[in-house]
UniProtKB/Swiss-Prot annotation:
Gene3D superfamilies: 1.10.1420.10, DNA repair protein MutS, domain I, MutS, connector domain, P-loop containing nucleotide triphosphate hydrolases. GO terms for molecular function: ATP binding; ATP-dependent DNA damage sensor activity; damaged DNA binding; mismatched DNA binding. ATP binds at residues 641-648. Residues 836-845 have a biased composition (Polar residues). PANTHER family: DNA MISMATCH REPAIR PROTEIN MSH1, MITOCHONDRIAL (PTHR11361:SF34), DNA MISMATCH REPAIR PROTEIN MUTS FAMILY MEMBER (PTHR11361). This is DNA mismatch repair protein MutS. One of its GO terms (cellular component) is cytosol. Keywords: ATP-binding, DNA damage, DNA repair, DNA-binding, Nucleotide-binding.
Amino acid sequence: MDPALLTPMMQHYVELKRQYPHAILLYRLGDFYEMFFQDAQLVSRELELVLTGREAGAIGRVPMCGIPYHAFDRYAAQLVAKGYALAVCDQMEPADQAKGLVRREVTRVITPGTVIEEELLQARQNNYLAAIVRLRGSKQTVWGLAYADISTGEFWVCQGEGQEQLEQELARLQPAEILLPTEEGLGLGLMRPGDPQAPLGLPGQYTYTLRPAEPFELATARENLLQTYGLRSLEGLGCEGLPLAIRAAGGLLHYLEETQKNLVQPSPQGGHPLLRPPRTYQLTDYLILDTQTRRNLELTQTIREGAFVGSLLWVLDRSRTAMGGRTLRRWLLQPLRDPEQIRLRQDTIQELLESPSLRTRLGSLLDSLYDLERLANRVASGTANPRELVALGSSLGKLPQLAELVAEAQTPLLQSLQQVDPALVDLGHRIEHTLLPSPPPVLTEGGLIRPGVDAELDRLRQQVEQDRHWIAQLEKTERERTGIPTLKVGFNKAFGYYLSISRAKAQQVPKEYIRKQTLTNEERFITPELKEKEARILTAQTEINQREYELFVQLRQEAGSQAAAIRQVAQTLAAVDALFGLAEVAVQQGYTRPVITADRRLIIEEGRHPVVEKSLPQGLFVPNSVRLGSPHGPDLIVLTGPNMSGKSTYLRQIGLIQILAQMGSFVPARRAELGLCDRVFTRIGAVDDLATGQSTFMVEMNETANILNHAGERSLVLLDEIGRGTATFDGLSIAWAVAEYLATQVRARTIFATHYHELNQLETLLPNVANFQVVVKELRDRIIFLHQVQPGGADRSYGIEVGRMAGLPQPVIERAKQVLALVEQHSRIGLGLRSQGKSRPSSNNPKKRFKQESNSRGIPDCDAKAGDQLSLIPTSLYPEEL
């Protein structure tokens, strides 16, 4: 397009659009942000707005779409949520003061990962911007990851190996945007979720931004980090020997510098104005929960509806602040492996439990706090509005009360609140003494500053008040002087102040009145003196608004200079709030403190599923116990029982209790002793993956393979109905082999729920396997689910009885019984492998032992041979002492 064919304003628009080709350009024209050309068509379609046109010069009309500036946040939130980037071009001078074309500049670029506006964020979830650098070798991908939330100041870096680990970290973080250097093989630009051109080997559900490679180069990235944080070495950050993590962090910082020009100004105190120095972590520092485990255990949302209600977080989150809620969510998705850190959290919960009065008063104070984490970055970026600054002042003003409340605290976290930074208290008082308690949200309309703060402001206000009083008295004096009882003083934005007189009295108007407007029932007049007073009021009001704005900006800058200290206090308060919430849950639900051990034990007495228990009337949930991990119990439990008996609930509650314990929480059990886990694996239910063309069984096998390849003896494995997605004998064979491998090779603590009752035979073959069942009570015409887990293996699944309960027609039920009888009669595997006893055999040779028992029970030779084949486990797999 030839710029010469465009109007000057359109030429400027096109020039800016070329600078930001991958963003929607919102161009401020008066009271609207306008979009043109393809951007207009896109926004019109996405937001269902009217598409109009505008004369652009010699090329004629071009597509145009606009949004009111006062509704910017609402529309911007929708576009950002859809994965778009926005370049916001604002007017830098009033239109009536411009000499020629109004000066406009792009003040910021809003991308999914660089949002700081409250309206565009979820209060209790982080909004992460991530950067990845990968080196794909012949063996394994080595990667560096940096991620930050510029609304809270968090900044983390990590380096690892293996594509699977990287994808699991991304799944935990759910970043709003991921930055990649162009060395990944793609051109520059933004790729929205679902884009078929997604970077090779990375999940397609994220927004990717492809960036120039230079800021990600090691020397450039390293220098950026050193200069930004005023360092001579990166050793203090813990990432000196992690080159890929350094590269990712440097690329992330450069992106913020480029897109947030007006927000990322050098801090007077040094460091980055929005991000604290990056913290380095290792994946092995935390309990690893893969995507399937987080989904199957419904940690943050339910499987069916994807809802928050019904998740574990729904039960746990009793925090009083948004920052406490975000902290709790992070802890839940990243449980600890450091027993000392776990103990510190437990100690704080214990102290709060043992002091109900402290807990009550602390809850009230936390209730009065605002989101200090995000408020700190709002003032640091210079974007906090008057109400947000009032909220900051109010929250800082509570710090002395918090310090007094925890004066006798015994735990380190609560004790840290005893030391209050006087500068923050002074700042809080200054804000409260400067700003009115309920200021308007718009910064330029006045009504911000309290009387007595500024002498010049007080003088101007007094002048306006006197002039308005004169105008108010004018109505009375003019009525008396003219003898017109209907005379009134009015005001509107178009004409200013005027004298209103009914048409019937128009003949009595004094000669000095100047007619301004004639309406159906009235005449409107002005006088020179009235206009003089009006001019004085308007001039003074403009000066008042400008002075209030200046005072507010000064105060906001003062608060911004304390942003780092505010973030530090906010981090402590968020942790206290999260633990306060866990203490509240422990009291309300009767949770107990688990004992964390260094061995492999997993002992839970009368454990309960926290979500199911919460959803049932009090006292109706049936608790169950478990002992796992030799020598305290078996390494693998084969769990059998009918459909609907509660096997899946039992599996999930064990996993949830382990996770709760390692995040530092108390647990729903009468007693628990738990050895630290490195990973929790689950395979509970499966569905077709149509997107990749995988059947239910293939999905199941992929998940099972992942467990067998990555689990170790410090892992917890929870498996439900392995092998059910294929033919019966194939499924049984796979289930047998998987259970056998877990018990003999992996030695992970495992619960293996199954309807293949033949697996009960493993108890007689392997000394570290035990059978347990969920029992039912049989009546003449129905069964009652007792939901009790007891030693021993079940020999029936009661599937037909469950079908009757579900409403299957009676002829179907009767025919099913006939077929079942035939199948059981002719199934050699069923006859050959069904366990007839619970005692452990004395023979040390499992193959010989099975043969002897088969013959002694009179099992036909063919069946014994089939059983012998299934039990051909190499003797080397059986340690003498398990």
